[in-house]
Amino acid sequence: MNVNDILKELKLNLMANKNIDESVYNDYIKTINIHKKGFSDYIVVVKSQFGLLAIKQFRQTIKNEIKNILKEPVNISFTYEQEYKKQLEKDELIKKDHSDIITKKVKKINENTFENFVIGASNEQAFIAVQTVSKNPGISYNPLFIYGESGMGKTHLLKAAKNYIESNFSDLKVSYMSGDEFARKAVDILQKTHKEIEQFKNKICQNDVLIIDDVQFLSYKEKTNEIFFTIFNNFIENDKQLFFSSDKSPELLNGFDNRLITRFNMGLSIAIQKLDNKTATAIIKKEIKNQNIKSEVTSEAINFISNYYSDDVRKIKGSVSRLNFWSQQNPEEKIITIEIVSDLFRDIPTSKLGILNVKKIKEVVSEKYGISVNAIDGKARSKSIVTARHIAMFLTKEILNHTLAQIGEEFGGRDHTTVINAERKIETMLKKDKQLKKTVDILKNKILTK
């Protein structure tokens, strides 16, 4: 029975009820509505808060009538229209938030796919190997051993393998775990009975594919290695696929039984190299798109990030997240320039910036003006040398944020007032001389991206 039929019959019954005054019925009951919520919950909605109070003495009568009509136990509550609408809006928000959470979770899960992996010279062979084995698990290259430094994309590839196999081979059971997780489980089970240890091994061996990320965490754990060795052999003997990743090649792994090292090399061992600049740049562009950054990020700004974060994909993603946060806080800025980025990443340690130091600034400026670095530090007062010296001081303050005293010391032991005058002079000239401004911008970009 739908709510319209219930409501129609309810009103007829209440109108015929001699205990309900006709004016009460016409003013407050005639306009009520009923809404169903869930399997057996009904809400009686009165027009106004005053109307809700007016029918208070008849609520039990209304409840009984509804139960008699439905002939089943139900839960009945009362409210008024304004409150009901507020609750609907609140429920809708909760539903939307829940939907957003689910969407984000799905998106997070789907991030680790072959389609989302940025391929470049540094990782192409590893990508091809993992994808090939995932398409034919247990057929060739068993085990597949991927190695390389942290942050190069090994975890992404292994999770992509898991997602691909689960999507395309529904009959295959896949187990993915980190080496640390496997070690902790093994240590726990080793405290228990022989029967429970065997059950642990059998449970893992029930899978068709085993993926262990960062297998190096199993090193120097003799008893754990014995369990691992048994599982390893079971998978190989039954043509079930093994994937491993490590920060070192099998030959360089310490703390493993030689039998395991030999078995790691049975299939295919392949390296993921350090990211080349081209691949790092492609990852940055993809991450900017993934994070839906509204501002345009200039190529110079992207090059800056790729130069200083190309050793770690996680750091690249973190740096783009920083851009995203800045963009959200500064929506009026439509373009993220290299000046903005260099200021945003001013906290990068000098060691990380490598050759980005005063020496590099002097070299770039002196090359532009056709003079030696010694001339910039020296006492010569020719116009071109003085201009180059002042620009180099200005850029040192602008890029490295050194103190006036530091800059004076770095430029031939000059007084800090000399540095102030140099900076002010360049700042004044930049406002008037468009060609000089263009030159300084080119020099700055070259220093930051070289």
From Swiss-Prot:
Free-text function comment from the UniProt entry: Plays an essential role in the initiation and regulation of chromosomal replication. ATP-DnaA binds to the origin of replication (oriC) to initiate formation of the DNA replication initiation complex once per cell cycle. Binds the DnaA box (a 9 base pair repeat at the origin) and separates the double-stranded (ds)DNA. Forms a right-handed helical filament on oriC DNA; dsDNA binds to the exterior of the filament while single-stranded (ss)DNA is stabiized in the filament's interior.
Gene transcribed to yield this protein: dnaA
Keywords: ATP-binding, Cytoplasm, DNA replication, DNA-binding, Lipid-binding, Nucleotide-binding
Name the record gives this protein: Chromosomal replication initiator protein DnaA
Ranges where the record places region Domain IV, binds dsDNA: 328-450
GO biological process: DNA replication initiation; regulation of DNA replication
Chain positions covered by the region annotation Domain II: 76-107
Chain intervals for the UniProt region annotation (Domain I, interacts with DnaA modulators): 1-76
Region of interest (Domain III, AAA+ region), residue spans: 108-327
Binding site for ATP: G151, G153, K154, T155
Pfam families: Bac_DnaA, Bac_DnaA_C
Compartment annotation: Cytoplasm
Domain of life: Bacteria
Subunit structure: Oligomerizes as a right-handed, spiral filament on DNA at oriC.
